[in-house]
Amino acid sequence: LKKYIVVGAGILGASAAYHLAKAGAQVTVIDRKDKGQATDAAAGIVCPWLSQRRNKAWYQMVKGGARYYPELIKKLEDDGETETGYSKVGAISLHKDPEKLEKMAERAAKRREDAPEIGEINILSPEETQSLFPPLSSEYGSVHVSGGARVNGRAIRLALVRAAKKNGTTFIEENAVSLVQDKKRITGVHVNKQVIEANQVIITGGAWSQELLSPLGINFSVRPQKAQIIHLHLENTDTSSWPVVMPPNNQYILSFEEGRVVVGATHEDDVGFDLRVTAGGVHEILSKALEVAPGLDESTMVETRVGFRPFTPGFLPVIGPIQGYEGLIVANGLGASGLTSGPFLGLELANLAMGKETELELQLYSPENAME
């Protein structure tokens, strides 16, 4: 029986562990529960098809991520996990300019040819838009995509962790101190004064991954980008089926059950692992959110979450073995699309580790791209 160690149990590590365990492998997950885990703070909008980002490798990854969700949710339900935080509530992308909405709808229709999961695409008037998400300003029309979904990062991660445990995965809440090395082969991990051995060590430590790789002389340049995300509450309002909202600025608004509305997020570079909720961050989020959805001005501020998104220098995730070493795989840099692509990349990572075929052309995501 092959043994695998996964270091870091955010969305990516939790998914990799689950898929390895489902395939019958022996899996140990090591996670030290740092504050500021990106997955824990994040509220995911699963609607990659309207993006104007031109990078084809990135789009293939997020498209695969969105497509895989319903299948994964079914697998988790078969494992008795129904609290996944995922719901296909549809998405609306807002704009004041009708021409921009036309172009957006055209882009979605073109992409639907190889992504039927997009579902129905409709251009909605400001009135129709507001009827779907009542707090919105009446200035915005929208493109509605029925296949859009939301996901609660904390809930999907915990569902994957519980399901991985049911399939025999061992979880250790400790710091993975260092990798065990035999010449150029990685054979395990030092944890809590003991050694855990494995055929493959998979590092999915997000913004913290460099710590394990530095002692090997590997300069893995993944940096944290700080996100602050605000949770609001609307009294006596059923928000459970409202669509996710993508305004024309770089923010998002989405609702969950029981009146909870999430608005975010900041994109703060070069502040390191600063966990503070800042006046400027809250001001930026709320001023942008209330401009788009003035009906939220009477909502209660419940909490502000902070997470550190891992980014590579080229902003494209990396996944693969580290050249010059055997038994060592890294996957990282999911950035702001981790909840869209993470579960799918975890499946790809499990297949890669087991020597099975992957769906993506993984050479496009070589870890060399994040080496300095």
Predicted feature residues:
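Helical element adjacent to the flavin cofactor pocket in flavoenzyme catalytic cores
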Residues: S142-N192, I196-Q200, Q210
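Beta1/beta-strand and adjacent pyrophosphate-binding region of the FAD-binding site
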Residues: L1-G10
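Short loop/edge segments at beta-strand edges and connector loops
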Residues: D31, S125-P126, I172-N175, E303-R305
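Active-site substrate-recognition segment that forms the wall
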Residues: S15-A23, I30-R32, G44-I45, E81-Y86, ...
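Dinucleotide-binding Rossmann-like beta1-alpha1 core, especially the glycine-rich loop
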Residues: I45-E128, L132, K288-L290
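C-terminal catalytic lobe of FAD-dependent flavoproteins
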Residues: A293-E372
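Short beta-strand to alpha-helix junction loop
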Residues: Q60-G64, K96-K103, V143-R162, R276-G281, ...
